[in-house]
Swiss-Prot record:
<dbReference type="GO" id="GO:0030041">
    <property type="term" value="P:actin filament polymerization"/>
</dbReference>
<dbReference type="GO" id="GO:0061024">
    <property type="term" value="P:membrane organization"/>
</dbReference>
<dbReference type="GO" id="GO:0043524">
    <property type="term" value="P:negative regulation of neuron apoptotic process"/>
</dbReference>
<feature type="modified residue" description="Phosphoserine">
    <location>
        <position position="80"/>
    </location>
</feature>
<feature type="modified residue" description="Phosphoserine">
    <location>
        <position position="67"/>
    </location>
</feature>
<keyword id="KW-0206">Cytoskeleton</keyword>
<feature type="modified residue" description="Phosphothreonine">
    <location>
        <position position="565"/>
    </location>
</feature>
<keyword id="KW-0945">Host-virus interaction</keyword>
<dbReference type="GO" id="GO:0072112">
    <property type="term" value="P:podocyte differentiation"/>
</dbReference>
<keyword id="KW-0677">Repeat</keyword>
<keyword id="KW-0728">SH3 domain</keyword>
<feature type="domain" description="SH3 2">
    <location>
        <begin position="108"/>
        <end position="167"/>
    </location>
</feature>
<dbReference type="GO" id="GO:0001889">
    <property type="term" value="P:liver development"/>
</dbReference>
<keyword id="KW-0132">Cell division</keyword>
<dbReference type="GO" id="GO:0070371">
    <property type="term" value="P:ERK1 and ERK2 cascade"/>
</dbReference>
<dbReference type="GO" id="GO:0030426">
    <property type="term" value="C:growth cone"/>
</dbReference>
<dbReference type="GO" id="GO:0015629">
    <property type="term" value="C:actin cytoskeleton"/>
</dbReference>
Length: 639
């Protein structure tokens, strides 16, 4: 059975699962058929747990617990010898003496490293590093991250922020000497073995102690052997500019451990800030408005909408688009630190969401300085990116914004106000009337044009016009005096084909009414309906007959047409319009129906032709079939 150590917290979802916490040891672990899950025993209870939340405890870590069997070797009993051979194996040169075992014990005792750069923890299980601190290395958790103890606190820290120290026989720690021609390599895994010296830190060249007298000879005189170095190309590139800083920051050979910071101080996280790259004006009440170069306190990156962050600026809290700002750090703005990669995604989909702590890599200071210099050397600022889409704005907000910005929606156009009644001109002319009168018959216009005389009483006409324009409140049709017909100046002009002149009307009234008259149309209609006979009498038996009329019949017709009131003319025009419109509609419908009937006739004819053809084909087929039957009958009878 294999043991595993818990790297991330996990809360059980089902009854057959284990709830595990960071640092716990799960015993007697075995793999299950289901991919991504293991089964083990914890606190007397056996259950399942995801394999990407734990790490297998390797055999090398058990050497620390074997101190008691090593002490028994001093007594020289056979049991200790058998245990030592089964643990370490039988060397090629024979059984080693006891002094060599003591050296191995001392060399595998501890690994220590010295902090070269400050590091602020981003998660609870990480250590806060200060320059010059000495950390006891426990193990390499994963590539780029080590587990160690600092100030009696166990936690994780990035391996590229420290430098491993060399441990001598006397238990003293010394910094590994940097050769000017060597390049720093990645961290190595501690793997103790018989007849071998401990690994050197970061692949630097040191002067190892020579091993003699155990049957191997002086085969390590050129230097120590590197075991299982896992140096990626990207890691070596990241660490190349680190060398001059390391050379400058190297202090004395030994330093005492500084215990100045408490655990609570190590858990304080730095505030996050953003620097705006482009100006932005908020379109909603919950959005921030900022200019280029302002610093926004970043509160949260999770707002429920992709592409939006929540922050605070000038005491106002709101959301803003993340592509208009770049994140900076308040405590350490010089460089962003490397992220730790997440654990392998072997477990089912929901399980990685339960990871409580996710490590982050942070790049080194020199790289950030280089990036900063390249940003400052950019020739021109890029164009502002497009604002990401946001949730639709409620109608009330949109209307308020439109009102505040001064935008007014266009209203429905009102009816135009009719012009004031025409005033008689010097020569007795009257302005042209509305186009509604164009619908009157052409014959009527011709009749009037033939009977148009000169106006003998211009003074009476002017007085009537002034009087009717003043009497807007009360209209009495009995007071209207008869007068001779008037001829418009454009009546004798050549006419375009299909166009008609406006109709004739009483000279005392204008066809265009003021708004007050339009409002009082019902009263006028009532008065007109009350005395139509009186109006006819007055018009037919006028005391002032026209001397210009040729016959009495034509005079009566002219008078009846001349003394039509504006209301009657308007009603007549409206009825004519309605009749004409309805007539046009009926004509269009009739034409459409005729087209439909013609189309149906054509389709019906085609169907009939098709049926006739089918019928003919059926007849021929039937006749052929009957002939075949007759032939078969004859053949049967003849046989």
């Amino acid at each position: 059975m294999v043991d595993y150590i818990v790297e991330y917290d996990y809360d059980a979802v089902h009854d057959d699962e284990l709830t595990i916490r960071v640092g716990e040891i799960i015993r007697n672990v075995k793999k299950l058929q289901e991919e991504g899950w293991l089964e083990g025993e914890l606190n007397g209870r056996r259950g399942m747990f995801p394999d990407n939340f734990v790490k297998e405890i390797k055999r090398e870590t058990e050497f620390k617990d074997d101190s008691l069997p090593i002490k028994r070797e001093r007594h020289g009993n056979v049991a200790s010898l058998v245990q030592r051979i089964s643990t370490y194996g039988l060397p090629a040169g024979g059984i080693q003496p006891h002094p060599q075992t003591k050296n191995i014990k001392k060399k595998t005792k501890k690994r220590q490293c010295k902090v070269l750069f400050e590091y602020i923890p981003q998660n609870e299980d990480e250590l806060e590093l200060k320059v010059g601190d000495i950390i006891d290395i426990n193990e390499e958790v994963e590539e780029g991250w080590w587990s160690g103890t600092l100030n009696n606190k166990l936690g994780l820290f990035p391996s590229n922020f420290v430098k491993e120290l060399e441990v001598t026989d006397d238990g003293e720690t010394h910094e590994a000497q940097d050769d000017s021609e060597t390049v720093l390599a990645g961290p190595t895994s501690p793997i103790p073995s018989l007849g071998n010296v401990s690994e050197t830190a970061s692949g630097s060249v040191t002067q190892p102690k020579k091993i003699r007298g155990i049957g191997f000879g002086d085969i390590f005189k050129e230097g120590s052997v590197k075991l299982r170095t896992r140096t990626s190309s990207s890691e070596t590139e990241e660490k190349k500019p680190e060398k001059p800083l390391i050379l400058q920051s190297l202090g004395p050979k030994t330093q005492s451990v500084e215990i100045t910071k408490t655990d609570t101080e190590g858990k304080i996280k730095a505030k996050e800030y953003c620097r705006t790259l482009f100006a932005y004006e908020g379109t909603n009440e919950d959005e921030l408005t900022f200019k280029e170069g302002e610093i926004i306190h970043l509160i949260s990156k999770e707002t429920g909408e992709a592409g939006w962050w929540r922050g605070e600026l000038n005491g106002k809290e709101g959301v803003f688009p993340d592509n208009f700002a770049v994140q900076i750090n308040e405590l350490d703005k010089d460089f962003p630190k490397p992220k730790k990669p997440p654990p392998p995604a072997k477990a089912p989909a929901p399980k990685p969401e339960l990871i409580a702590a996710e490590k982050k890599y942070f790049s080194l200071k020199p790289e950030e300085k280089d990036e900063k210099s390249t940003l400052e050397q950019k020739p021109s600022k890029p164009a502002a990116p497009q604002v990401p889409p946001k949730k639709p704005t409620p109608p009330t907000k949109a209307s308020n914004l439109l009102r505040s910005s001064g935008t007014v929606y266009p209203k429905r156009p009102e009816k135009p106000v009719p012009p004031p009644p025409p005033i008689a001109k010097i020569n007795g002319e009257v302005s042209s009337i509305s186009s509604k009168f164009e619908t009157e018959p052409v014959s009527k216009l011709k009749l009037d044009s033939e009977q148009l005389p000169l106006r003998p009483k211009s003074v009476d006409f002017d007085s009537l016009t002034v009087r009717t324009s003043k009497e807007t409140d009360v209209v009495n049709f009995d007071d209207i005096a008869s007068s001779e017909n008037l001829l418009h100046l454009t009546a004798n002009r050549p006419k375009m084909p299909g166009r008609r002149l406006p109709g004739r009307f009483n000279g005392g009234h204008s066809p265009t009414h003021s708004p007050e008259k339009i409002l009082k149309l019902p009263k006028e209609e009532d008065s007109a309906n009350l005395k139509p006979s009186e109006l006819k009498k007055d018009t037919c038996y006028s005391p002032k007959p026209s001397v210009y009329l040729s016959t009495p019949s034509s005079a009566s017709k002219a008078n009846t047409t001349a003394f039509l009131t504006p209301l009657e003319i308007k009603a007549k025009v409206e009825t004519d319009d309605v009749k004409k419109n309805s007539l046009d509609e009926l004509r269009a419908q009739i034409i459409e129906l005729l087209c439909i009937v013609e189309a149906l006739k054509k389709d019906h004819g085609k169907e009939l032709e098709k049926l006739r053809k089918d019928l003919e084909e059926e007849k021929t087929m039937r006749s052929n079939l009957e002939m075949e039957i007759e032939k078969l009958k004859k053949a049967v009878l003849s046989s």
